[in-house]
A protein has these predicted regions:
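A generic structural motif
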Residues: 6, 46, 69-71
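Substrate-contacting helices/loops that form the catalytic groove of nucleic-acid
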Residues: 50, 71-234
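Hydrophobic residues embedded in beta-strands of well-ordered beta-sheets
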Residues: 3, 30, 38-41, 66, ...
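Charged, flexible boundary elements
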Residues: 16-51
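Low-complexity, highly charged intrinsically disordered N-terminal segments
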Residues: 1-17, 28
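Gly/Thr-rich phosphate-binding beta-strand-loop-beta motif of the actin/hexokinase/Hsp70
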Residues: 53-72
Length: 234
């Protein structure tokens, strides 16, 4: 277990141990605070050493659960499994039906407005990838992160079938938008699914089939392997 540390300018430094953080707080050298449920300390004095090691974030996207790991060569600082955003599609449908009801009451012969089409991501797709980006933004504020290692998921296509994802996929558009925004925070390294499996087998780790289970072997095992593939360590 480690405690994230930031300096007086809110810049992230290398995490410290809980015992050292406690001594800093008791002596007045640091102030405790919480950042999205994570206990952190803010230094009130000039740090003796501001050098940072290479820290990577492993990201394992999923349809129901997602894994995030913050790791350096020597230590694993954070392993979290979050719930993916799955409620936006139903919320948008309810909003659409209520709006349709209001329009029918007021203007029963209303014609379609064909000049209001807009580009961009659909609300449900945008919410899914914005959620991942917000988590990465919060981690970047408390850890000296240099690189994000992401498993590059693919959309399923159907040969000789007229499906919406044969020529267009919200998944592909959403992840490309996410990668573009993530590059503003640091270096982005992509790994294919089979590469993640090879790395996992090389380290002798197992992944369970129950992806919604609240255990390390569900999603965090892959996010840990992805981060470890960049910085190394065990």
């Amino acid at each position: 277990m480690f405690v994230p540390v930031v300096n007086q300018k809110q810049e992230p430094l290398m995490p410290t141990t809980p015992s050292r953080a406690k001594r800093w707080i008791e002596s007045g050298k640091a102030t405790p605070f919480f950042k999205k449920g994570i206990f952190c300390v803010r230094l009130n004095v000039e740090p003796s050493n501001q050098e940072t090691q290479e820290v990577a974030v492993g990201i394992d996207p999923g349809s129901k659960k997602e894994g995030f790991t913050v790791k350096s060569l020597a230590h694993t600082y954070l392993n979290i499994q979050t719930d993916a955003v799955t409620w936006v599609k139903d919320a948008v449908e309810i909003r659409r039906n209520m709006r349709k009801g209001r329009r029918f009451r007021n203007t029963p012969c209303r014609t379609n407005r064909m000049n209001r089409k807009r580009g961009g991501l659909s609300p449900s797709t945008k919410a899914r990838w914005q959620w991942k980006l917000r988590i990465c933004n919060q981690l970047k504020k408390i850890f000296p992160i240099e690189v994000f290692v992401v498993e590059d998921i693919k959309a399923k296509t159907f040969k000789n079938k007229i499906k919406w994802n044969t020529s267009f996929s919200p998944l592909e558009v959403g992840k490309n938008w996410f990668y573009t925004e993530l590059e503003k925070l640091g270096k982005v390294e992509l790994k294919q699914g089979y590469e993640t499996k090879e790395l996992r087998d090389l380290l002798g780790l197992q992944k369970i089939k129950e992806k919604t289970a609240e255990v390390f072997e569900a999603h965090c095992v892959d996010s840990w392997v992805l981060a470890s593939s960049w910085v190394g360590g065990k």
